[in-house]
A protein has these predicted regions:
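Nucleotide-activated donor-binding/catalytic signature segment of Leloir-type glycosyltransferases, i.e.
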Residues: 244-266
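A charged, aromatic-enriched C-terminal amphipathic alpha-helix characteristic of glycosyltransferases
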Residues: 344-370
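A short, histidine- and acid-enriched strand-loop-helix "catalytic/donor-clamping" loop
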Residues: 94, 111-127, 142-143
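Aromatic "clamp/platform" in nucleotide-sugar-dependent glycosyltransferases that forms part
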Residues: 283
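Conserved acidic donor-binding segment of nucleotide-sugar-dependent glycosyltransferases
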Residues: 315-316, 320-327, 336-341
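Conserved donor-binding/catalytic core segment of Leloir-type glycosyltransferases
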Residues: 196-215, 222-225
Length: 376
């Protein structure tokens, strides 16, 4: 099975780390894990962040030119070497796939989408042109893999329900949790390195320190911790342009906050294993890869019940879902969690991640849907 892959928002080779880049790479890994031969068809980043129709039309022309080049390139190959399917990850009105539908039509191959979203309110206004392009791609899709179940509501009017396939968020668990360190030694090492009290509860947040929703989550977390009347320490892993704002937000809650900065991916399991509770308000997040990483490492979580967070956390079993945007409720949920049997909850989290959120499960879902279409 030969699959042409495209990520219009951010190509998998983009130099800046992000959840989007991670998921693009994971999708490629899952497809390959299932036996597919995957090639990146284009690295054109179609994202338009300003409500400028002229810029949107210019991007559409660039996409059409890229599609024409791809069609010429593929048609020059023998049929046995051409893609049998096109797969686009993360399409919405700011990042339209101007390439895939045209190539799929020209080669007469199925067109697949993952994490597509549709915003009907954008049908009018400055993004109307790009909105129409995204809608056309959604209507063209032979199947759409829904990583965030919230997207289904707006996708259902555009396509048959049978074409919507649930794809729970996933990780390459074998790589990420292959050698989980011993909790006691990991905790001792971090405590000594950063001056953290190993005998007090460790709360952990892992996120880029960015403006917008990430900063909103940090501010809500800071507000919640002001109401937490018990010992705690907060470890923050991540960095970014909003570091100063995050530092200011945390200042009123005293000296129990430790900004560890951005860490190499291979060092993250030690931090997850050493901590007691993952805490993240997840403002406006689809699901959050760090949350899934925490669960895979056996770390219970309290998270805001935004978007598809509930696809990762089984409320009361692997962690706790908190009322979105409510700092008081978030504080109460942390307080409740710290009195719970976190060891048992953590074991349940790891079991759930292993069963539903690994490459095996993702590959099975992806490959089965593609094969069904190719068999027709």
């Amino acid at each position: 099975m030969r699959v042409a892959f495209y990520a219009p928002l951010k190509p998998p080779s983009h130099p800046v780390p992000s959840g989007d880049r991670t998921i693009a790479r994971l999708l490629i890994a899952a497809l390959r894990h299932g036996g597919a031969e995957v090639t990146v068809a284009s690295r054109l980043r179609s994202w338009i962040g300003v409500p400028d129709e002229a810029a949107q039309r210019a991007m559409a022309k660039r996409g059409a030119a890229a599609a024409a080049r791809a069609i010429t390139r593929y048609c020059a190959l023998p049929k046995r070497a051409r893609p049998q399917a096109w797969f686009t990850y993360h399409l919405y009105y700011k990042a339209v796939d101007w390439i895939g539908p045209a190539v799929a039509d020209a080669l007469d191959i199925p067109y697949f989408l993952a994490e597509a979203s549709h915003a009907p309110k954008r049908a009018e206004g400055p993004y109307a042109f790009s909105h129409a392009g995204a809608e056309a791609a959604i209507r063209r899709a032979d199947a759409i893999f829904c990583v965030n179940p919230v997207d289904r509501v707006c996708l259902e009017p555009l396509t048959a329900k049978r074409r919507l396939v649930d794809l729970p968020p996933f990780l390459d668990l074998a790589r990420f949790t292959r050698r989980l360190p011993d909790r006691a030694s990991a905790r001792q090492t971090l405590a000594r390195r950063h001056g953290i009290d190993p005998d007090q509860p460790w709360l952990l947040a892992v996120a880029m320190l960015r403006q917008g929703d990430k900063l909103a989550s940090f501010r809500l977390l800071a507000e919640a911790l002001q109401h937490l009347d018990r010992p705690w320490q907060l470890l923050i892993v991540g960095d970014g342009e909003a570091r100063a704002e995050v530092t200011r937000a945390m200042k009123p809650i005293g000296g129990g906050v430790f900004l560890l900065g951005a860490l190499p991916r291979e060092q993250l399991p030690a931090v997850y294993v050493a901590s007691d509770l993952f805490v993240w308000p997840a403002v406006n997040e689809a699901f959050g890869m760090a949350l899934l990483e925490a669960q895979a490492c056996g770390l219970p979580a309290v998270a805001g019940a935004w978007g598809g967070v509930s696809t990762i956390i089984a409320d009361g079993e692997t962690g706790w879902l908190s009322a979105p945007g409510d700092a008081t409720a978030f504080s109460a949920d942390i307080d409740f969690a710290l009195d719970a049997d976190l060891v048992a909850i953590g074991k349940a989290a790891r079991r759930k991640a292993a069963k539903h959120h690994g490459l095996d499960a993702a590959a099975a879902t992806l490959i089965a849907a593609i094969r069904r279409k190719l068999a027709k």
